[in-house]
Amino acid sequence: MATLRSFVLVDNGGTGNVTVVPVSNANGVAEWLSNNSRSQAYRVTASYRASGADKRKYAIKLEVPKIVTQVVNGVELPGSAWKAYASIDLTIPIFAATDDVTVISKSLAGLFKVGNPIAEAISSQSGFYA
């Protein structure tokens, strides 16, 4: 069983990495935040549910804030201009072997690996072209 622990969400080679820490595990939903201010935090939630008698369902959500500095009464304060959201629902049959689910995890990591078409489209704010 996975333990709730901190992890590096954004790896910038050690300079300015974003690490999220566990803050909650209520009602089957685990939650991680990058800092104490929810409005300025990177946020990850994950849940696990049985889906029928033969499936397991994982729901993972990610919030990525755009941090800005605002001046209020002459004082500079950090804030969030907007947030980007991602949501992944993953359903796995209960008869999937350890090797099978390892391949699924690696496939998810590969989707967003720098240099792959999906990561390139997101980072260039464009679509997919032949």
Swiss-Prot record:
Identify the Pfam families for this entry. Answer: Levi_coat (PF01819)
Q: What Gene Ontology molecular function terms does this protein carry?
A: RNA binding; structural molecule activity
Keywords noted in UniProt: Capsid protein, RNA-binding, T=3 icosahedral capsid protein, Translation regulation, Virion
Note the superkingdom of the native organism.
Viruses
Q: Record's Gene Ontology CC terms? A: T=3 icosahedral viral capsid
Name a biological process GO annotation.
regulation of translation
For region Viral RNA-binding, the annotated ranges are: 31-104
Q: Where in the cell is it found?
A: Virion
Q: Does the keyword Disulfide bond apply?
A: no
Q: Which family does it belong to?
A: Belongs to the Leviviricetes capsid protein family.
The subunit structure is:
Homodimer. The capsid proteins form dimers that assemble by group of 5. Twelve such pentamers are linked together with free dimers. The homodimers binds to the viral RNA via an operator hairpin, but also to many other RNA sequences in the viral genome; this interaction probably shifts the virus from the replicative to the assembly phase and ensures specific encapsidation of the viral genome.
List the protein's name. Capsid protein
Could you tell me which species this protein originates from? Answer: Enterobacteria phage GA
